Swiss-Prot record:
One of its GO terms (molecular function) is S-methyl-5-thioribose-1-phosphate isomerase activity. This is Methylthioribose-1-phosphate isomerase. The active site is at D240 (proton donor). It holds the Pfam family IF-2B. Catalyzes the interconversion of methylthioribose-1-phosphate (MTR-1-P) into methylthioribulose-1-phosphate (MTRu-1-P).
Amino acid sequence: MSTIVTIPRSVSWKGDAIAVLNQTKLPHSTEYKTLTTIEEVWKSIVMLEVRGAPAIGIVAAFGLALVAKKYTTLHIEEFQKKFNRDCNYLGTSRPTAVNLFWAIDRMRESIQEITTIKEAQKILEEEALLIQQEDEAVCRSIGEHALSCFQDGDNILTICNAGSIATAKYGTALAPFYIGKEKGVHLHAYACETRPVLQGGRLTTWELKQAGIDVTLITDNTAAHAIQTKEINAIIVGADRIVANGDTANKIGTMNLAILAKYFGIPFYVAAPLSTFDITKQTGAEIVIEERDETEVTKIFGKQVTPVGTTVYNPAFDVTPNELITGIITERGIIRGDYKREIASLFEKTS
């Protein structure tokens, strides 16, 4: 029996503006923010108003389509020059999220051979919309493949938010929960709160509750105890960058969960689209890890909670070694075993 599930969206194209669900306001208010300039798009990404690797790529694509409409130049050469400058500018917003650069490169390549400004503007808008539409289909496919890894009644642990509001729709790590709900397969989510910005506590719980999916919130340091006492059957996470050998960058704390999964003998899955793979890098050691402002740790909702002047180390991501990963779930299926060979083979087939 199929069920209609309410699935929130995070990015909408309005033709002359972009509407983004301001995720910094969740769960207390559902506020959509209107972006009309490339600077506002950049700031929205940096400030985590829009977040999640696929969603960042989508909003960046729309941002480039938007700014291209506002160029006043009459010559295509000058248009391309300005466009490349804005591509480079947007690329400075979140250095670890490979989908950002994938979307920027795709937008850039879409108009490489175009000879008129009007045609370039039209193609950029069409390409951005296509990126969003494709991501929705990709996420649904990831959800279908991921659901095959689980059984009705499973308790599944996740971290951060790799859900619908981090993508075009459905999400990656959360996609099987939505697809399962539609198909009558009950999966219970255990969500790590995900310090310091609380994407699990604020966002994952919010969107799953919106859809009527069972979710239990735990503190990050409860994970081992929860696996031990709550019959956690598996762990599933998203990804911000997966390199050629399968090493995976994701929200800080992900590697902790992978180590716990190994110890307790439960599967640890990564769910991500092919656009999250960066096969130009051979191992996780080559991934640049973004470090964020110390106030994310020293303050909670603006209130100082540590002694002033405390030294802080605040990386946004960690890298999980491939040997800790049971399988990488993509829109093309599940990669297992020799990740370097399987990933290379997958990209040979798609090229």
